[in-house]
């Protein structure tokens, strides 16, 4: 059973990765910054919870090269779930992997758009370029890799688009970006994590791009809103934000506030997630493991109705 270390294992998607790794009985490690007096109680509690579940937490800085090399020599697979501001520090992970010499697979922090095949508005493009730099560095170092394009984090975007609550009791406005007809892919974070742990240890996925595009999870904003209205019993006022307004906001808002609107434009107006055909050497994740299945969008919304969905959060861009 492969030993897996997760960088960013206490972050939003990283927490799901850690739990998924444990669920498949992998010896699981986290490399994390040391706690400080300013650390939140929830951060302390999460580390205590993970330790009680058997996770080995190594505290250290990204610049501690020798420490990272020593830790990496104890594991087989490296998964980075670092947030956008930490993307460049993955070059330090690559250096440590090269020095360790034993890592069977590296999965960089991706899990969103397939960056080599789209060109969004400049603020989001600058984020994707940071990811491309990491990809090219991995390839130049000839490290065994898997690139995961997981598309939209399902609970994150349901929270963002529909702002639901466990027991909705009031009507609210819902913003529709563009016409609302553009198709995108919505995958529950728990499933993204489970498939990621599986592909990280699957020889078929070595040096390949794995795309999480289950046909049943391709949907438009209008379809998602209709499904939520039927399920919640509520009727929402729809407010359209046209293409031109998103473009203008991406130009006028300061950094990093211009990044989220550029992402919204990419996904919900341009349709970048569905803008390319799968190549013959791509792997579509939902075909890989008969014992696993992606949660349907209907099932995802049920989590919100029952109050079992992850709470709202916002991505960090600086």
Swiss-Prot record:
Listed EC numbers: 1.1.1.319
Tissue expr: Mostly expressed in petals, and, to a lower extent, in sepals, stamens and pistils.
Keywords from the named record: NADP, Nucleotide-binding, Oxidoreductase, Phenylpropanoid metabolism
Residues the entry annotates as binding substrate: 260
Binding residues annotated for NADP(+), in chain numbering: 10-13, 32-43, 84-86, 109-111, 131, 151-153
Effect of mutating residue 88 to S: Confers eugenol synthase activity. High eugenol synthase activity
Active site, renumbered: 131 (proton donor/acceptor)
GO biological process, any: phenylpropanoid biosynthetic process
Protein's name in the database: Isoeugenol synthase 1
Lineage: Eukaryota, Viridiplantae, Streptophyta, Embryophyta, Tracheophyta
PANTHER family: PHENYLCOUMARAN BENZYLIC ETHER REDUCTASE-LIKE PROTEIN, PINORESINOL REDUCTASE-RELATED
Xref: SUPFAM superfamilies: NAD(P)-binding Rossmann-fold domains
Residues with site note (Required for activity): 263
Pathway of action: Aromatic compound metabolism; phenylpropanoid biosynthesis
Keyword Oxidoreductase: yes
Protein encoded by which gene: IGS1
S-S pairs: none
């Amino acid at each position: 059973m492969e030993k897996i270390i997760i960088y960013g294992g206490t972050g939003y998607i990283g927490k799901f990765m850690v739990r998924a790794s444990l669920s498949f009985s992998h010896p699981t490690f986290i490399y994390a910054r040391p706690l400080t007096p300013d650390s939140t109680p929830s951060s302390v509690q999460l580390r205590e919870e993970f330790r009680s579940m058997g996770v080995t937490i190594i505290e250290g800085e990204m610049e501690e090269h020798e420490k990272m090399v020593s830790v990496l020599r104890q594991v087989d697979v490296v998964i980075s779930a670092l947030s956008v501001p930490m993307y460049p520090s993955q070059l330090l992970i690559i250096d440590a992997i090269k020095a360790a010499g034993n890592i069977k697979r590296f999965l960089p922090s991706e899990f969103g758009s397939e960056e080599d095949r789209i060109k969004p508005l400049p603020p989001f493009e600058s984020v994707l370029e940071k990811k491309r730099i990491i990809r090219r560095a991995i390839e130049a170092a000839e490290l065994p890799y898997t690139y995961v394009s997981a598309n939209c984090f399902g609970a994150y975007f349901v929270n963002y688009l529909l702002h639901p609550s466990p027991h909705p009791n009031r009507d609210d406005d819902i913003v529709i970006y563009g016409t609302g007809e553009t198709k995108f892919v919505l995958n529950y974070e728990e499933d993204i994590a489970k498939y990621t742990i599986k592909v990280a240890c699957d020889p078929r996925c070595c040096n390949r791009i794995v795309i999480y595009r289950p046909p049943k999870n391709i949907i438009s904003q209008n379809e998602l809103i209709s499904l939520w209205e039927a399920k919640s019993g509520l009727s929402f006022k729809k407010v359209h934000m046209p293409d031109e307004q998103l473009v203008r906001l991406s130009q006028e808002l300061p950094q990093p506030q211009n990044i989220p609107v550029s992402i919204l434009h990419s996904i919900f107006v341009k349709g970048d997630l569905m803008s390319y055909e799968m190549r013959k050497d791509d792997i579509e994740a939902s075909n890989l493991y008969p014992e696993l299945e992606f949660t349907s969008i209907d099932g995802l919304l049920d989590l919100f109705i029952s109050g079992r969905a992850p709470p709202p959060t916002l991505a960090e861009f600086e």
